[in-house]
Structure formats: C-alpha cells, structure tokens
Amino acid sequence: MFVASLKSRFLNVLKSLQNHFTPLKVVLLYHAVQAENTDNTFNNIAISLANFKDQIKHLKKHINIVSFEQLLQAKKDAVVLTFDDGYANNLLRVLPVVEAENVPITIFISSFFMDGKREFWWDELAFYVTQVSVQKNHSETEKREMYNSHSSKIMPLDQLEKASYIEELFLRENMQLPFREEFRPLSLQELKILCTHPLVTIGAHTHKHNRMALFGKEEQHQDVFDNIKWLEEISGSSPKLFAYPHGGKTAFNSISKSVVKELNFSHAFAAYSGRISANSDKFALPRIHVGNVKGEELI
C-alpha cells in the first residue's frame, strides 16, 4: 500500500488510481537519466542518477516492478518502467541500475536520431534558448515563451526541416550546435547492446518523432513503418509495443490509432496519467510521468 505524501504529485496520482478490489497496475514514463540534474529541456524530462536509484529502491519495497507482458497477468499491484526516445544514458546510466536491482525496462526508440551525431532537436532548442536568455537577461517567463514559440513552429515541420530551423537559429547568433554526453542519443552499437539484453524490451516510437496528429494518414503510416523496418534490421525482431511521440491527448488522434493497429502492434502508450485496467484502450494506454524527485517522495 502506498504511503500518503503531500509533497508528491506523483503519489497523489497513484493514490487516486487505487482500487481496493483490483490490483493497481501502472506504467511509468521516463526519458533521460543524467549524472546530475542538468536538465534544461523546459519539459522536465530528465532526472538525476541519484534520484533514479532511490526511486527504484523505494518502488521495489512497495510494488512489483514487472515487464508489460507480466503486468497484463498480474494479480498484485505492479508497475512497468518505460523510457522514451533513446538517450545514450539509458544504456550508460539506467542499465547498470536495472541490472543491479534485476528489474525489466522498456525503451521506445525514435530511429532517425540513432546515429549518435546530433542531440534531439528539443534539447538543441533548449540549449539555444538558455544561452540567448543569459546574454539578453531574459526572465524565466521570457525563456519559456521563447522556447514555446520556436517549438510550435518546429513541430509541424519534417525532420530535415526541423534540423535546418535549429541550425539557422544557431547561425544567427554565431553559436555552435551542442553535443553533450548527457543529452546525446544512442549510437547504433549502443542500441544493439540494449536489443540483446534480457531485461530490456525495445518498442517503437516513430522514425522522426513527429507529433502524429499534425500529419495526415500517409505521413503517419510512413513514419511508423520506417521505424518498424529500421528496428527489425537492428534487432532482428519486430516491435510489438508502441509509444506516441509527445504523447498527450492532442499529440495523436484516431488516425494515429488506426495506423498503429494496421501495423500489428499489440498495444500503444500515451503520456497522460491513469491506471491500466481491463477496460483500458489498448491503443491509448496511460503512463505516469516521473519527475526528478527522491524515492520517498514517490512512496
């Protein structure tokens, strides 16, 4: 049974989902785990390694950490750990922790980025906004507005256009594109290690990480199809689990769900809070985003 904690929005979500007559089944959403709290993405998607270790230890004391396949059959409270995008720190920092604790994880890969040569565009944009804001003495509100303004313009673009947009921003300010160890995507060789690891399940996350609802069916289908074929070539097997990029309720639509069904995924995950039940939509399963907090603030 989870212990009440006023500090934790995460815990409040879990408590609101509990039902004394059925087991609590939830899926947690992570992205990057960094050596320290160096996240500047404006999206709160990175947590420190120390907090991640603490979270796993505390979770293990109170709930079973299982694979998604095991969650579907679970008779007791259970939780699944998922990671989106394909950050290199999923191998370098997360894997040693899950090996030590012997817990399974699922990583959803956006294949376009897996050459290890550039950061994800949202991290590049965050770096740009942070540096420019320091030079111009922007307030936190102004920084947020700048990031959101550029992000809204970038979202509808194709991936190559996204990259060009970012490059133009940096060129305009005579800045170099960053390539930071804590933010870089997996290399192909690193991904292959994860693909063969017994504690890791690899899922699909589109090829280009487009916000699917902004595109028509043909573009959505191609983006997911390319991701599947790329992952098949790298791993030797076809992914059965899918996660919608960005993941909120407006990030995908009925067309997105039909594409995922047509391409033979068994389940698809969103990024809004909720529990998994027999009545859950298999192609819009909820996940709870985990913040950069200590384990005791979770449970």
Language model features with spans:
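Generic enzyme active-site microenvironment
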Residues: 82-83, 203
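C-terminal active-site subregion of NodB/CE4 polysaccharide deacetylases
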Residues: 1-82, 89, 120, 196-197, ...
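Short, glycine/acidic-enriched loop or turn micro-motifs at the edges of active sites
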Residues: 87-88, 208
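Aromatic-lined substrate-binding rim segments of carbohydrate-active enzymes
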Residues: 89, 97-99
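Glycine-rich active-site/cofactor-binding loop and its immediate structural neighborhood
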Residues: 80-82, 99, 104
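Metal-dependent polysaccharide deacetylase catalytic core of the NodB/CE4 family, i.e.
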Residues: 34, 101-250, 284-285
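A metal-dependent hydrolase metal-coordination microenvironment
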Residues: 83-85, 125
